[in-house]
From Swiss-Prot:
Key word Iron-sulfur present: no
Top-rank lineage group of the source organism: Eukaryota
Family of the protein in this entry: Belongs to the hid-1 family.
Organism expressing this protein natively: Dictyostelium discoideum
Biased composition (Polar residues): 690-700, 719-760
UniProt entry keywords in alphabetical sequence: Coiled coil
Keyword Hydrolase: no
Annotated Basic and acidic residues bias: 147-191, 701-718
The protein's name: Protein HID1
Coiled coil: 139-191
Name of the encoding gene: hid1
UniProt xrefs under InterPro entries: Hid-1/Ecm30 (IPR026705)
One Pfam family this sequence matches: Dymeclin
């Protein structure tokens, strides 16, 4: 009965706030702070009404809450009681709900209250002050508040006494100085007297200024709030052990807080005196929740301008303050790096006790990602100009690189990550990454059902790994040269393979392709993929022989065997394959057949003529095959055998022509080859293909049939299915649509324009840097399939024979045709003499050579990733989508006006 009545009075107090202007000294605030804030939609509605109807009361309430935090970490720092900490937790919970409501409005309320210290005037309705406080029930928290007010008065008296004593000490020192000056020589007496009088006058003016500043504090309320939150994260007795001392660490170390105040040891600090307990984790959680809401201003900014948006909150914590940077960075990293949900491997251990370390680990990763992502672009001319010539694009890239080199990053956290060089820290982070990434896979494939809790930190941690790899090249090198470096790809590629099945999980596919693109630019990483495959996979594919087989198999499934076509990653995935191909050895027959099926899929007229830029996909794949033939011919005889068996497809492309009568088929009718499971089936499929030196003529009837009748699957999508999907998104913008479930990954969408080769968002000269003469462009983020189809219907691209002959000159097909014409007669003669024995053919190919066939073997070309405004805005949207989806209890951002991405209710 008591709790129900107190809850009613609590709600009644909010109703009073919505009707009348309440002064700062009113007892009504005691009633509001006397009860914990429950996760109830009523409180959220009341806070929104308070913001809209009585903004002056909300501003007073915010000042009241911030003053409580300042009081706990300031005046009564050494005399806090458990009741004071309880009141602090209540204040933190209120602030974490109020800040998103303040940010979503987009008005000047936040600037006036938090940064300008201006008062909020009431709205048009008349204001009335409360004369008598409402009757409240006697609770523990109200008694705490009354005791706290008494303590405040006592503390003020103590401070006044200290100030009087300090003034007396200063007067004594001045008198001593005067006595010493009188003992000097008579010649200098006049000079010394003048200097003493001037110093006395300046001291008096300084004292007057200090008294004026003490009477009117000009520090922004946001700075007080952020400084209090950072102090509470390392507050002895609240979040760390009391053995560190209750006095402020700024007295002993004014430059930076000692790293011993970190929560855990491991990264950056070997050991810390703090021992974890449940209450520490609860207090840390409340502070972290309030901190992430302070940094959530980007959620309420449109994605078009988020890459250049400057947040005062993020500017202060990443640039202005330096005192807590190292300790905060170490604490956030070590919190999730030391998290081990499996532990000793006791089954069903998560049912015996609740682990608060898990929630803090998730928030720590998310706050770390927010801090490391904030680096607003200074100049606005970051969009790729695709209408310019190639030399103009190179000049534009050089200017951008010079500007990036001259403009230093202001973010202290990014600067610290870039300067890390300790190998021990790299190994510690990498081992934690491998362990946490494997937890969901282990939990989903245990012999005892639900014996291991499925901790899903892999999405946040994958993004953190991307940030570390992109910022610190030494860390990238250490990962590449690690003794078991390719093993961390096993969970990553499995998540990518699972993510392709649903549109809500395409985000993990995108971030995985970025990581692979970054790694593929390193020669040592490409060579390490030739190691024998040692690991356990849980997806429905054959056990790979080497890591290269595993990578190509997953890439094949991403491009071909996907319900919703991920056309935006086509060029990125094929670029990865092109970077890795010069170093791949001993590819299995299954992998070689998949490469041939992929070439068949991309080179069919139905796919090739769909848009005027699809030929580039064929060019990347042909470049990869050329690299394998030129640089790894002796170790890839299976690939040569597969090329000879599928030479008909290369001949078709070489002699392809377009007659004026030939219509272009819609993309919905493109057939996809199905995955091949065993090497025996691969040999069987290849044996069914005919070897012929004569080019086959093309017709529409033959192009509708595949070389292998039962090996392709139809991926046609009905028009009714396309029309049934909602298309309420704004075109020509990039948006993220989080699903309504907690486990789903947000879908990052972009939309093609009517001319994909000119206006569609691409990762072109600004995104992928290459040494080739032709700029390579990557379209990012992924367009939804229904919008791509609409674009094709609007653009009405009709290929001509002149266009076809022009693009065929750009395709590197000559070397493969030379190999076919050189080896095909020899293989035919061998088959007619002794029969078609695969083993004899393979032995013969091992003895063969292609010396003299390639006149000008091209150099190894590597394309690297470079950031631009489009990809940067996509990363920010993807990061905040994950944060939004995983913070539902308590609901920090639910039912607020999110502008960064679209929320489907």
């Amino acid at each position: 009965m008591g709790t129900g009545s107190s809850r009613e009075q609590h709600l009644n107090s909010f109703n009073t706030l919505q009707k009348e202007t309440v002064p700062f000294s009113s007892d009504l605030w005691k009633t509001i702070l006397s009860q914990n804030l429950e996760d109830d939609s009523l409180y959220l509605e009341n806070l929104k009404k308070l913001k809209n109807e009585r903004p002056e009361n909300l501003a007073t309430f915010i000042k009241k809450l911030v003053n409580q935090l300042v009081l706990v970490k300031g005046l009564q720092r050494e005399t806090n009681t458990p009741g004071d900490f309880q009141l602090t937790s209540i204040s933190l919970s209120y602030l974490s709900r109020i800040l998103p409501i303040v940010f979503e409005s987009g008005d000047d309320f936040a600037d006036k209250v938090f940064w300008l210290n201006e008062g909020i005037e009431p709205l048009s309705h008349p204001s009335a002050k409360i004369s008598t406080p409402p009757s409240i029930t006697t609770t523990k928290t109200t008694e705490i508040i009354e005791e706290q007010e008494k303590k405040d008065q006592e503390n003020k008296q103590v401070e006044e006494n200290k100030e009087n004593e300090e003034k007396k000490d200063e007067e004594k020192k001045d008198e001593e100085k005067k006595d010493e000056e009188k003992k000097d020589e008579d010649k200098k007496e006049n000079k010394t007297t003048t200097t003493t009088t001037t110093t006395n006058t300046t001291n008096n003016t300084n004292n007057n200024n200090n008294s004026d500043e003490s009477s009117f504090d000009t520090t922004p309320l946001a700075v007080k709030l952020m400084d209090s939150l950072l102090d509470l994260l390392f507050f002895p007795g609240f979040t760390v052990t009391e053995s560190l001392g209750l006095k402020s660490p700024k007295e002993a170390s004014p430059d930076a807080i000692p790293v011993l105040f970190s929560w855990a040891g491991g990264f950056g600090v070997d050991s810390v005196p703090t021992v974890h307990n449940k209450q520490f984790w609860i207090n840390r959680l409340s502070v972290l929740q309030c901190l992430i809401t302070c940094l959530s201003e980007q959620l309420y900014v449109p994605q078009d301008s988020v890459s250049t948006f400057k947040s005062k909150w993020l500017d202060w914590i990443t640039h202005t303050q330096e005192y807590y940077t190292e300790a905060l960075l170490f604490s956030l990293i070590n919190t999730f790096a030391t998290f081990d949900p499996i532990g000793w491997g006791i089954p069903y251990n998560h049912l015996m006790y609740s682990d608060d370390h898990e929630i803090c680990s998730k928030l720590s990763i998310q706050i770390l990602n927010v801090l490391l992502t904030y680096d607003p672009i200074e100049n606005n001319d970051q969009q790729p100009q695709q209408q310019h010539h190639h030399h103009q694009q190179q000049h534009h890239q050089q200017q951008q690189q010079q500007q990036q080199s001259t403009i230093e990053c202001r973010n202290k956290f990014i600067q610290y990550i870039k300067t890390l060089k300790r190998v021990r820290d790299f190994k510690f982070f990498f081992n934690a990454f491998e362990r946490i990434m494997n937890v969901p896979l282990i939990a989903s494939h245990t012999k005892l059902p639900n014996s291991t809790k499925k901790i899903e930190l892999h999405q946040d941690l994958t993004y953190t790994m991307w940030l570390f790899l992109s910022y610190n090249h030494d860390f990238l090198r250490s990962i590449v040269n690690y003794e078991n470096s390719p093993e961390f790809l096993i969970p990553l590629l499995q998540y990518m393979d699972e993510g392709r099945k649903s549109q809500t999980t395409h985000g993990i596919v995108q971030i995985g392709t970025f990581i692979l693109l970054l790694l593929s630019g390193e020669r040592d990483f490409s060579i390490s993929l030739n190691k024998p495959f040692v690991g356990r996979i849980h997806i429905d594919i054959q056990q790979p022989q080497v890591y290269s087989d595993f990578v190509i198999t997953v890439m094949y499934r991403l491009l071909v065997d996907t319900p919703d076509r991920l056309e935006s990653i086509y060029e990125c995935v094929l670029t990865i394959l092109s970077n890795l191909s010069p170093y791949m050895k001993n590819l299995s027959m299954v992998t070689c057949v998949k490469l041939m099926k992929l070439f068949e899929y991309l080179s069919t007229p139905r796919f090739l003529f769909a848009t005027n830029h699809n030929y580039r996909y064929v060019g990347f794949l042909l470049e990869s095959l050329n690299n394998l033939l030129q640089h790894q011919y002796e170790s890839n005889t299976r690939l040569i055998y597969a090329i000879l068996r599928c030479q008909n497809q290369f001949s078709k492309l070489a002699y392809l022509k377009i007659s004026p009568v030939t219509p272009s088929k819609p993309m919905e009718q493109i057939t996809q080859p199905s995955p091949i499971s065993t090497s025996e089936e691969a040999f069987g499929k290849l044996n069914k293909l005919s070897i012929s030196e004569e080019p086959s003529t093309l017709s529409n009837e033959k192009s509708d049939k595949t070389t292998d009748g039962g090996d392709h699957q139809d991926e046609s999508i009905s028009k009714s299915k396309v029309q049934s999907k909602p298309t309420t998104e704004h075109p020509n913008s990039t948006g993220a649509t989080p699903s309504s479930t907690n486990s789903g990954t947000p879908t990052i969408k972009a939309f093609s324009s009517t001319t994909p080769n000119q206006e569609s968002p691409k990762l072109g000269g600004d995104g992928i840097d290459s040494q080739s003469s032709t700029p390579n462009k990557q379209q990012l983020p992924p367009p939804p399939p229904q919008q791509t189809k609409k674009t094709q219907m609007v653009s009405h691209f009709m290929p001509t024979d002149e266009w076809l002959q022009d693009i065929k000159k750009q395709l590197p097909l000559d070397n493969i045709l030379k190999v076919i014409t050189h080896l095909s007669p020899q293989i035919q003669g061998l088959c007619t003499g002794s029969g078609s024995d695969e083993q004899k053919i393979m032995d013969y190919l091992k003895m063969s050579t292609i010396v003299g066939i390639f006149h000008n073997p091209g150099p190894i070309m590597t394309r690297r990733y470079h950031s631009n405004a489009i990809t940067k805005s996509w990363f920010i949207a993807y990061m905040w989508c994950i944060i939004y989806l995983e913070n539902h209890s308590p609901p920090l951002f639910l039912h607020t006006n999110i502008k960064l991405f679209q929320v489907k209710q």
